[in-house]
UniProtKB/Swiss-Prot annotation:
It holds the Pfam family DUF480. InterPro entries: DUF480 (IPR007432), WH-like_DNA-bd_sf (IPR036388), WH_DNA-bd_sf (IPR036390). The lineage of its organism: Bacteria, Pseudomonadati, Thermodesulfobacteriota, Desulfuromonadia, Geobacterales. Disulfide bonds: none annotated. Gene3D superfamilies: Winged helix-like DNA-binding domain superfamily/Winged helix DNA-binding domain (1.10.10.10). This is UPF0502 protein Gbem_0194. It comes from Citrifermentans bemidjiense (strain ATCC BAA-1014 / DSM 16622 / JCM 12645 / Bem) (Geobacter bemidjiensis). Belongs to the UPF0502 family.
Amino acid sequence: MRMNLSELEIRILGCLMEKELATPEIYPLTLNALASACNQKSNRDPVMSVTEADLLRGLEALGARGLARLTTTGGRVAKYCHSATDNLRLAAAERAVLAELMLRGAQTAAELRSRGERMTEMGDIESVEETLRKLQQHGPPLVVRLPRQPGRKEQRYLQVFAGLPEFPDELDISEEMEPAAGPRAAAGRPAVGNERLERLEEGIGSLRQEIAALRREVQEMMDAFA
């Protein structure tokens, strides 16, 4: 089953999963509470501005995929909840990790551990890495590990509810690291600069090969569960 959710659908699902864990006393959410959660400025990247009409369309799409539903809790006001716990069989720590990735984008295991604590006990860094492995091996995979960015020590993880990312864009290679154009630019470089640039170019080439292999591997895994 491929997700291919829209940005709005991912925001809605992430908010429902977040509020279930972080504020269970107000969960399931009314449409107004869900709008506030989707539009809040803290713990969100990007910040969005959605209307109740947008939310109803997104909830309908999620409902068709078995990821959200309308529920009643004894009152007359319509409330909404997610169905990821049952349909995707996700534990609390797995839902917390996915909620963070949906609401803030790609993050390291350390960032997920720190930020996920507001929703549930995350354990030590090894526990978080094990949770991420389970999500990577889920059928279908729900998370991928991105190639390490140049100059950064830790690798980041990304949810794939919107489908596979364009990995080369995730490398975030700055213009300063790209080779200078033309023979005139090359002639003006000092020898040390040339050596450093060659090493960087080799590293970028290796990264692109790793990206291609990773993309093929993830695509094969997703095809197997399609």
